[in-house]
Amino acid sequence: MAAETASGYIQHHLQNLTYGQLPDGSWGFAHSAAEAKAMGFWAFHLDTLGWSVALGLIFLFIFRMAAKKATSGQPGGLQNFVEVMVDFVNGSVKDSFHGRSPVIAPLALTIFVWVFLMNAVDLVPVDWIPQLAILISGDPHIPFRAVSTTDPNATLAMAFCVFALIIFYSIKVKGLGGFIGELTLHPFGSKNIFVQILLIPVNFLLEFVTLIAKPISLALRLFGNMYAGELVFILIAVMFGSGLLWLSGLGVVLQWAWAVFHILIITLQAFIFMMLTIVYLSMAHEDNH
């Protein structure tokens, strides 16, 4: 255990491996939340970046391998799994996306599998990966957070990429004038030109809040659920390491029970992120408000 107290243990497991400029002007790793905060905006969460990229490459490798081994005869287990995933996502896109775009289904598949893989790391016992990082680095105080979706920087980055696509397709389908009109002429309208002009600021405020709420809610929903799930695992680990025999036994039972339930959570959160992305992009392809 990297920290002697329960609170220190929890704080250590909820801190990212942060690299940035230290208060003395040198560059290095933060060993406390205070040091990470002092680094400011231009600090890098290397654990989030590393795991996100690694799991993305694993996703590409698995699906590429399945595509290369695809045969018209008897398919193997991996090919069956990939085909089920592709059919499931393709069906979800057909049911929810009402426009025409060849990139939506591949985007939805990428989001679902990538987010699921990042969420699935939460099923690894909470001490294994941080202890491995300590073993490799030789620093007993270095933090390491393996679940990328418990970092709001990761979920917000994905959500604002979706937001950029919403803006892009809104302008592409409706034109710049149509997009601006959508923000300023709805939900309140009037046949009187003077009244309509007066309503523009009100409409813009309401529509802007609705628009910007999409990526924020998309990111915070995923982050909040995964952060809470990770915190429960950490609290169970604290109970397990309390030294009391009956609490340790209860901790084992709770750990397995929560892990089984968490399989549903990680899958559901990946599905929700994918479905909301499809719905938002479908709305961006609609000509009418």
Swiss-Prot record:
GO BP annotations, alphabetical order: proton motive force-driven plasma membrane ATP synthesis
The entry's keywords: ATP synthesis, Cell inner membrane, Cell membrane, CF(0), Hydrogen ion transport, Ion transport, Membrane, Transmembrane, Transmembrane helix, Transport
Membrane topology: Multi-pass membrane protein
InterPro entries: ATP_syn_F0_a_bact/chloroplast, ATP_synth_F0_asu, ATP_synth_F0_asu_AS, F0_ATP_A_sf
Predominant cellular place of this UniProt entry's protein: membrane
Listed Pfam families: ATP-synt_A
Official protein name in the record: ATP synthase subunit a
